[in-house]
A protein has these predicted regions:
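Conserved N-terminal catalytic/coupling substructures associated with nucleotide/phosphate chemistry
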Residues: 1-150
């Protein structure tokens, strides 16, 4: 769908592109490095490694295993208390290697338990659905594995 708008004497081309079923897509940047990008509020941002993994997780059913321990519980409580956490804070609080923290965040985002937001401090992660988090803690991850999240 294409439309041309006239704004302050200029022509603005608006193109509606349907959501891709095979995300993520990469393009080569000026340094020859392949990057994924996303558009938010009329701005283009380079996708974080977590966002790229989220897109990859949405496209496949075999996902990382979820494990729960006292440190993950501490992380969940911080989100319940309304905290917005940067990636490094999530990894440190949950005592996870960065790759494992990426996997955890991806699962929780795909399962619609947490969401990310781009703020003044960069990307932050926050609780999206407290009841889903409660369900994950009480009933386990099997409740979420069979659902279609894409």
């Amino acid at each position: 769908d294409v439309q041309v708008w006239k704004v302050e004497g200029r022509s603005v081309l608006e193109v509606q592109i349907p959501r891709s079923a095979s995300r993520p897509h990469f393009c080569e940047d000026e340094n020859g490095k392949w990057q994924a990008y996303l558009r938010r509020e009329d701005r283009i941002h380079r996708a974080s490694p977590v966002q790229v993994k989220v897109w990859q997780y949405e496209m496949r059913m075999d996902r990382s295993e979820f494990r729960y321990d006292q440190f993950i519980g501490k992380l969940f409580n911080a989100w319940r208390d309304g905290r917005q956490l940067r990636f490094q804070q999530v990894a440190r609080m949950a005592r996870l290697r960065y790759e494992d923290a990426e996997d955890l965040l991806c699962l929780l985002i795909v399962w619609n338990i947490i969401e990310w937001e781009r703020g003044a401090r960069g990307l932050v992660y926050q609780l999206a659905d407290a009841s889903a988090l409660d369900e994950l803690e009480t009933r386990g991850p099997e409740q979420f594995r069979c659902k279609n999240y894409s």
